[in-house]
Amino acid sequence: MFVGKYKDFPKIDMTQSGAKGAVKQVVVGPEQGWEDYVLRVITLDVDGYSPTHTHDWPHINYVISGTGVVMISGQEYPVEQGTCAYVPSNEEHCFINKGDVPLELICIVPLRGEA
């Protein structure tokens, strides 16, 4: 069992090529007893974005706060607090903060997707 606040977890700069103003926090994973998946919180600063990329696993996202877009295979979808997004395997994607406050979102991936 595990109970905690995501704000208490260390922030890790996302330094991949194509990222700007992006950090992640690994909140739930094997250390908390979830062996097969990882729940991360991604924060994008104003004008920040995650790298455009693809991979062979899907992921699920939920927007905690802020506004922006998720790009999936060249299609732009607006996101705001309360928006869910499912990104299928092998679809090119990224998140972009289009608002005037940080964009915070939950990102759930299989364990192999946490690098």
Model-assigned labels for residue ranges:
Residues 1-36:
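A short, N-terminal "cap"/entry segment at the start of jelly-roll beta-barrel domains
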Residues 40-55, 89:
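Conserved short histidine dyad/triad with adjacent acidic residue
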Residues 42, 67, 75-77:
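Well-ordered beta-strand scaffold positions
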Residues 48, 56, 75, 91-92, ...:
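A generic "binding-loop/recognition-motif" signal
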Residues 49-51, 69, 85, 89-95:
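Histidine-centered metal-chelating micro-motifs
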Residues 58-68, 73:
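Glycine- and acidic-residue-biased ligand/ion/polar-headgroup-sensing regions
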Residues 75-89:
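Short acidic-glycine-tyrosine-enriched beta hairpin
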Residues 89-114:
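Ligand-binding loop in jelly-roll beta-barrel domains
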